[in-house]
Amino acid sequence: MTRVKRGYVARRRRKKILHLTSGFYGAHSRLFRVANQKAIRALAYSHIDRAKRKRNMRSLWICRINAVAREQNISYSYLIKSLKEKKILLNRKMLAQLAVLDKPSFIKLINTHLN
């Protein structure tokens, strides 16, 4: 029986990895062994950074809410505590959208429910 050295299976696997790393710099996009390491690392980073993005967005929303709240001489923590006590079910994302896109209604929300 003739010997088959992986045939097209290995070529397909290598091509897939090289396609994944096609935008990378230098040998990282041309040589399979290096490209394979970089592809694994890139996929790991993308997995980690999806969780980081959630953290970063939450802190951005908090910064935006705090900025507009402090213009009204109210601290962020007091604002959130008061909204919870009044049972206003707006999460931080919604509050940040209001603060950025519809500032007058956000200020009205603060003034009517906190005073």
From Swiss-Prot:
Keyword field contains Lipid metabolism: no
Keyword tags: Chloroplast, Plastid, Ribonucleoprotein, Ribosomal protein, RNA-binding, rRNA-binding
SUPFAM superfamilies: Ribosomal protein L20
Coiled-coil stretches noted in the UniProt entry, renumbered to this chain: none
Compartments (UniProt record): Plastid, Chloroplast
One Pfam entry name: Ribosomal_L20
Chain's role: Binds directly to 23S ribosomal RNA and is necessary for the in vitro assembly process of the 50S ribosomal subunit. It is not involved in the protein synthesizing functions of that subunit.
HAMAP family named among the record's database cross-references: Ribosomal_bL20
Protein's UniProt name: Large ribosomal subunit protein bL20c
Organism expressing this protein natively: Chaetosphaeridium globosum (Charophycean green alga)
Record gene name: rpl20
